Swiss-Prot record:
GO terms for cellular component: chloroplast; chloroplast stroma. Its cofactor is [2Fe-2S] cluster. This is Ferredoxin. It comes from Solanum lasiocarpum (Indian nightshade). [2Fe-2S] cluster binds at C39, C44, C47, C77. NCBIfam families: fdx_plant. GO terms for molecular function: 2 iron, 2 sulfur cluster binding; electron transfer activity; ferrous iron binding. The lineage of its organism: Eukaryota, Viridiplantae, Streptophyta, Embryophyta, Tracheophyta.
């Protein structure tokens, strides 16, 4: 399956379709969008975003705790879309600040 992903960035929203077996960050880059990242392994907060609507599978994440995930935070480098999803990007400061 493939889902519509909408990323709300400081430069404005971007939308693309993302298969459910491709990480959202990887697909965004394939579409030509620059997003923040560091480790690409779900072990830091550089790529953090916040889910506005929809759901993801980020079971490869090792950084976020259950409370942060419950609060809507997502690591885009290890997030597969599980529905049409809207995510606010560039949320590292909100997460760790």
């Amino acid at each position: 399956a493939s889902y519509k992903v909408k990323l709300i960035t400081p430069d404005g929203p971007i939308e693309f379709n993302c298969p459910d077996d491709v990480y959202i960050l990887d697909r965004a880059e394939e579409e030509g969008h620059d997003l923040p990242y560091s480790c690409r392994a779900g072990a830091c907060s550089s790529c953090a975003g916040k889910i506005v609507d929809g759901s993801v599978d980020q079971s490869d994440n090792s950084f976020l705790d259950d409370d942060q995930i419950g609060g809507g935070f997502v690591l885009t480098c290890v997030a597969y879309p599980k529905s049409n999803v809207t995510i606010e990007t560039h949320k590292e400061e909100a997460l760790v600040g």
